A protein has these predicted regions:
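Acidic, negatively charged sequence tracts
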Residues: 1-193
Length: 193
């Protein structure tokens, strides 16, 4: 589990100014935190963290010397400026189930010999205790053939009794369909007029 260093943010300084100075703003909230705790982290530290972790990942958040077991709840990415503006964290309590998402990662798609893969779902929503959190669900699609479908209920996360799925178990994660090359028929003289 990765650790991210942060510091309490003074609300006297605007977020825009902090971003210009190389910081990313955020909030830490949770049952044992009154209201929420405004924080700031260096852009460099956030960029490093997001190389391996994202929304739904569990991280250790160190704020002014105090360490929190936290879940990344939201990442506010500014596409126009090509930067992360804000990250929100939820402080975890070992006995409290939290709502999270797990990213779906398709493995071995280059080994599918016939057909085209259609990914219908990018993440799975669920509730679990901190000890049972999952940030990525890997799906091996190498054996898929035309007509094959993998649903949420087919994945390991759905079979874990400690996880309460919020995504429909019947939802299609990925399917393999035939390639249809449509060749336009030549126009006849009558149709051209």
């Amino acid at each position: 589990m990765n650790t991210l260093k942060a510091e309490k943010r003074s609300m006297d300084v605007k977020a825009k100014k902090l971003r210009r100075e190389g910081y990313v703003t955020g909030n830490l909230f949770g049952r044992e935190i009154e209201g929420s705790l405004p924080i700031q982290m260096t852009k460099k530290a956030v960029d490093q963290l997001l190389k391996t972790d994202n929304k739904g990942s569990q991280v250790m958040l160190e704020v002014d010397g105090k360490t929190y077991d936290a879940l990344i709840k939201e990442v506010d990415y500014n596409a126009m400026a090509n930067r992360v503006d804000e990250i929100d964290f939820q402080a975890l309590v070992s006995t409290e189930k939290v709502h999270s998402v797990a990213e779906i990662v398709l493995l071995n798609h280059e080994k599918v010999e016939a057909g085209v893969l259609q990914e219908d779902l990018e993440e799975i929503s669920y509730k679990a205790l901190p000890a049972d959190l999952v940030d990525k669900v890997q799906v091996d699609v190498s054996e898929m053939k035309i007509g094959d479908v993998i649903k949420v209920k087919d994945l390991e996360i759905a079979k874990n009794p400690n996880i309460d799925l919020k995504t429909d178990p019947e939802a299609v994660v990925v399917s393999c369909t035939a390639v249809h090359n449509s060749v336009p028929e030549p126009e006849t003289a009558e149709e051209a007029e």
